[in-house]
Amino acid sequence: VKTVTIAESINIMSKTIGPAMKEKNAKPIQEMAVAEAEAGADFLDVNIGPARKGGDEMMEWLVKTIHEVVALPLSLDTTNPVAMEAGLKAHKKGGQPLVNSVSCQADRIDAGLELVKKYGAQMVGLLWGTEGMPRDVNERAALAVDLVYKANEKGIPSQDIFIDPIATPVKGEINQVIACTEFMGMLKDLAPGCKSVVGLSNVSNGTPDKLRPFLNRAYLLMLYQQGLYSAIVDAYDKELMALCRGEHPELVELVSKVMAGGEVESKALPTQQQHYLKTVRVLMGKSLYSDSWLEI
């Protein structure tokens, strides 16, 4: 069983890729696209941010530049609708592109859905409402049901909708992490036929760089237990990509047992499994987060 992967590294915030985007320097971007494809990514995310000035030209150039070297579908990641449309127009390879994203904000949702329908794209339905971040599971559920209803009304089929409940940093509000996990388990009943996606790196935001992969990997396996379909991932994390391919059944089993409330004696486990056990306990809110959670 596999998790569909959307590789996250072609991002305007990157120290190497950002300048290459602005200077229309194809080489580093194409090299990264090839590396992410070779790592096994199913989609490549192309994140240009709000790109207020010249975003349409930039997105069109990026789609064509990337598609010169790989034939994967792209996740077009921008809050600029003009840039989004330019990317959708230019997207000719790899099947349906993914609009990342359509949020639930009253002033944005209709225009977003129109673009998805017009270009026959798939979409990330971001559960960010007019009041901002949903506070709990119930607010996420209400936003999801409303979003899917509106999308279906426009003629967008449920199988083209990837619901994103918004993962938040474990260093922030642990109840939000728990709500995201819980919501994932409810999604198939709330919105039958829809897919799901989560930005895994969000959960480790603000934690020490060398520890981030532990959180990202453990959270992937927790959400996988809850029926996760796809994830926005660091394709350069080999262990994470192996988990997405369905390798390491012993880790899947361990996480499943911990989430079901089973007793696990950590001292009897190999080091790698001890790390997963400790990390899952933090992400479930059973242990308090601190930068030394793996040593405790």
Regions found by a protein language model. Give the residues of each.
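Structural preference for beta-strand elements that scaffold enzyme active sites
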Residues: T3-T5, D42-D45, P73-S75, Q96-L98, ...
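Distinct, well-ordered alpha-helical segments
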Residues: G55-V63, M84-K92, G112-L115, R140, ...
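Active-site mouth loops of central-metabolism enzymes
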Residues: T3-E31, G55, N100-A106, T130-N138, ...
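Extended, intrinsically disordered, low-complexity segments
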Residues: V1-P19, Q30-E31, A235-I296
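Catalytic beta/alpha-barrel core
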Residues: D45-A51, L72-N80, Q96-D107, L127, ...
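Glycine-rich, proline-tolerant flexible connector loops at the mouths of alpha/beta enzymes
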Residues: A37-L72, A167-V177
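Active-site-proximal loop/turn and secondary-structure-junction residues that shape catalytic pockets
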Residues: I10-I12, I48-R52, N80-V82, S103-Q105, ...
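Catalytic alpha/beta core domains of metabolic enzymes, predominantly
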Residues: A111, K118-S266
